[in-house]
């Protein structure tokens, strides 16, 4: 049973699974996966918690890197797919806001899941609790100027030139976004909200990057360079 059916994920799960496949969508395949892999491989991480693991794709990537991984997600249909693809994996129904793993993980990952969490403060607190002292919190997130775009986002001006509209940037809000038979409730928050919550837990910022595309069509690459979708942050919990 889903922990929360009001965010669109339960009804969008089948379309999401079909779009992701094994390689992921454009953003994962051509923008995020390479730098995210670089942050987990060869660093001696023994165990990891993937918060908002969805269909388990990044859990499988971490396991192939030799990291024992637990994935949690509030959508049962996504977990069912994760277990189907990885029968020996550890996938659990749960939310970041209410999980309680104790300080037991070398690595906690949020791969494009913070925008789905209604109580960001509780979610980040849960992630920090799950880290052992000295552990790493690795976050891939949508940029806040991008999430400030909907409902207008990409439009065309009077001469047909594509423009991206940003508005109400400082106003935290939930917005329904729809694409390819999916309709999901996403949260916009200014970057300062994320940074303040993470800093208030005493975490130390070790990396902030805005990765560029490594492939895709010329149109996809050009659009991403004009209005980047993603950033990556790595934080360390003090010893």
Label every model-predicted segment.
Residues 1-43, 57, 78-81, 138-172:
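Conserved class I S-adenosyl-L-methionine
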Residues 107-120:
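A short SAM/SAH-binding and catalytic strip from SAM-dependent methyltransferases
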């Amino acid at each position: 049973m889903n922990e929360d059916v009001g965010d669109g994920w339960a009804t969008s799960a089948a379309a999401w699974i079909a779009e992701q496949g094994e390689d992921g969508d454009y953003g994962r395949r051509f923008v995020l996966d390479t730098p995210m892999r670089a942050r987990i491989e060869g660093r001696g991480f023994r165990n990891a918690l993937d918060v908002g693991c969805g269909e388990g794709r990044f859990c499988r990537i971490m396991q192939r890197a030799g990291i024992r991984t637990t994935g949690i997600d509030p959508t049962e249909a996504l977990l069912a797919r994760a277990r189907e693809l990885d029968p020996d994996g550890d996938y659990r129904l749960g939310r970041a806001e209410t999980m309680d793993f104790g300080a037991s993980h070398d690595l906690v990952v949020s791969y494009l899941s913070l925008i789905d969490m209604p109580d960001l403060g509780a979610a980040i607190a849960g992630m920090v609790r799950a880290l052992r002292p000295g552990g790493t919190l690795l976050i891939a997130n949508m940029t806040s100027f991008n999430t400030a775009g909907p409902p207008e986002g990409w439009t065309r001006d009077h001469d047909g030139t594509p423009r991206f509209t940003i508005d109400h940037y400082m106003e935290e809000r939930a917005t329904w976004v729809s694409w390819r038979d999916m309709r999901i409730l996403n949260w916009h928050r200014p970057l300062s909200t994320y940074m303040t919550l993470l800093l208030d837990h005493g975490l130390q910022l070790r990396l902030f990057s805005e990765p560029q595309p490594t492939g895709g069509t010329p149109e996809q690459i050009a659009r991403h360079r004009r209005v980047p979708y993603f950033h990556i942050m790595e934080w360390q919990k003090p010893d």
